[in-house]
Amino acid sequence: MIRSELIQKIADENPHLTQRHVERIVNTVFEEIIEALARGDRVELRGFGAFSVKARDARVGRNPRTGEAVEVEDKKVPFFKTGKLLRDRLNAK
């Protein structure tokens, strides 16, 4: 499912909301999650999961084409840990 399909699904299930309102809500939710992660905050959606930022150390990698050693700088990456309810639904418990 892509963002536009999510917006359409929510709009279809909530006829009192226009598609433009739903789009604004979905975009705001995503933007707030992104801003919180950029500040280094953790975002927890109970039952669904938690978004956080993890630090990756610098390392020596390899260029797959040439096999040459390449320095990979340290960086921050987004991380998602699933919640128990989501795991249980995926595993049909």
Curated annotation (Swiss-Prot):
Belongs to the bacterial histone-like protein family. GO terms for biological process: DNA recombination; regulation of DNA-templated transcription; regulation of translation. The keyword Ion transport does not apply. This is Integration host factor subunit beta. Heterodimer of an alpha and a beta chain. Keywords: DNA recombination, DNA-binding, Transcription, Transcription regulation, Translation regulation. GO terms for cellular component: chromosome; cytosol. SUPFAM superfamilies: IHF-like DNA-binding proteins (SSF47729). Pfam families: Bac_DNA_binding. GO terms for molecular function: DNA binding; structural constituent of chromatin. This protein is one of the two subunits of integration host factor, a specific DNA-binding protein that functions in genetic recombination as well as in transcriptional and translational control. It comes from the Bacteria.
